Amino acid sequence: MMVDTGVDHRAVSSHDGPDAGRRVFGAADPRFACVVRAFASMFPGRRFGGGALAVYLDGQPVVDVWKGWADRAGWVPWSADSAPMVFSATKGMTATVIHRLADRGLIDYEAPVAEYWPAFGANGKATLTVRDVMRHQAGLSGLRGATQQDLLDHVVMEERLAAAVPGRLLGKSAYHALTFGWLMSGLARAVTGKDMRLLFREELAEPLDTDGLHLGRPPADAPTRVAEIIMPQDIAANAVLTCAMRRLAHRFSGGFRSMYFPGAIAAVQGEAPLLDAEIPAANGVATARALARMYGAIANGGEIDGIRFLSRELVTGLTRNRRQVLPDRNLLVPLNFHLGYHGMPIGNVMPGFGHVGLGGSIGWTDPETGVAFALVHNRLLSPLVMTDHAGFVGIYHLIRQAAAQARKRGYQPVTPFGAPYSEPGAAAG
């Protein structure tokens, strides 16, 4: 059964023409037609940017669609290879690197971090375990005193954290908005001798046979193309707002203090200097199909397309022993942090785990149902900011409904990119 949702299912990797961004491109199993329509409604015009959505069911891609524009001017249509900076959704990728290392016996979650990274044992941190740090319980969330230049140097930040004295929230769940990444990269460097940017390639992109997962700016010869962030360009020049944010960060909010630094807003504008750094908690660049493929492997017991990405035992450990949902001391909302991912404090509306980023880009997996998805876009601080941070919940609800119907009545994986989507069995959603 073919379902027409307005998806242009020509197999092209980029799209020319002034109106290309107004159409949905890609493919989807017809059971997911309502999912595609909900996604398409997110990008009504040029000033709202663009994005992509990919869904996996039992290790098979069943949705792979994109729409909108990849630049602020609204001249460059989104393509299959467009990839925005996904902010904190990067943490899920970084955590997965650590799990790959643990799977090979290089890291034990119950071992002290200092066992691998001796410098980290300074100032009362000798007994902090890998699990503690991955649960955001290290007491090292604050950025007080760190300059923008410091944050653009990952080695400096790793050294600062290794020497730091834990704060009063040691042992309590307190979201490490930026420092989580350098804690993970320092640990990974200690056991591999490699930086996290290289490990993204070796531990994620290469075994998954995809180019669309990068830490920072992709190489010039990579097919992945960075989508520009769409946000009000006059915010950085607003002296009153900048002063207010600085005061808020240093006096009132631990959560804000964990992510604010001088020049934070300007850093993601223009050519985005953050892309040239290694910030493993925030500056990942990902296509939806690549991020969904990573989470699709986890949802499928650690395997995808015959590739053993993670052991079944490790995936089982990710789904078991998830702690009671308690209020996070920095975010002031209940979240379930477990080994680098988080759950959602909304009952059974969004089962599973993954990581959402600032603006609403997200990667998510539910091994109990075999469903995984990724939604990425380049919109930040737009008039739709509240919708962006809640919209993925509604889309995931539609995905779960469609997946249940697809299991009952059968489904057809989308055709691998590059082949005509109009061939038999490759239905456009």
From Swiss-Prot:
Positions of the catalytic residues: S88
SUPFAM superfamilies the UniProt entry points to: beta-lactamase/transpeptidase-like
Activity regulation remarks: Esterase and beta-lactamase activities are inhibited by the active site residue modifiers phenylmethanesulfonylflouride (PMSF) and diethylpyrocarbonate (DEPC).
Catalytic activity: a fatty acid ester + H2O = an aliphatic alcohol + a fatty acid + H(+); an acetyl ester + H2O = an aliphatic alcohol + acetate + H(+); a butanoate ester + H2O = an aliphatic alcohol + butanoate + H(+); an octanoate ester + H2O = an aliphatic alcohol + octanoate + H(+)
Class of enzymatic activity (EC top level): hydrolase
Single GO BP term: glycerolipid catabolic process
Xref: Pfam families: Beta-lactamase
Effect after changing S88A: Loss of esterase and beta-lactamase activities
EC numbers for this chain: 3.1.1.-, 3.5.2.6
GO cellular component: extracellular region; plasma membrane
Organism domain of life: Bacteria
Thermoactivity: Optimum temperature is 40 degrees Celsius (with pNP-butyrate as substrate).
Main location: secreted
Keywords: Cell membrane, Cell wall, Hydrolase, Membrane, Secreted
Mutagenesis / variant outcome for changing K91A: 90% loss of esterase activity
Localization of this protein: Secreted, Cell wall; Cell membrane
pH and activity: Optimum pH is 7.0 (with pNP-butyrate as substrate).
Listed GO MF terms: acetylesterase activity; beta-lactamase activity; triacylglycerol lipase activity
Induction section of the entry: Up-regulated in acidic and oxidative stress conditions.
Record's function text: Shows both esterase and beta-lactamase activities, with a much higher activity against phenyl esters than against beta-lactams. Shows esterase activity against both long-chain and short-chain p-nitrophenol (pNP) esters, with a preference for shorter chain esters. Hydrolyzes substrates containing beta-lactam ring such as nitrocefin and ampicillin. Functions as an immunogen that activates both humoral and cell-mediated responses.
Family under the similarity heading: Belongs to the beta-lactamase family.
PANTHER family with a match to the protein in the record: BETA-LACTAMASE-RELATED, BETA-LACTAMASE-RELATED DOMAIN-CONTAINING PROTEIN
Protein name: Esterase/beta-lactamase LipL
Source species: Mycobacterium tuberculosis (strain ATCC 25618 / H37Rv)
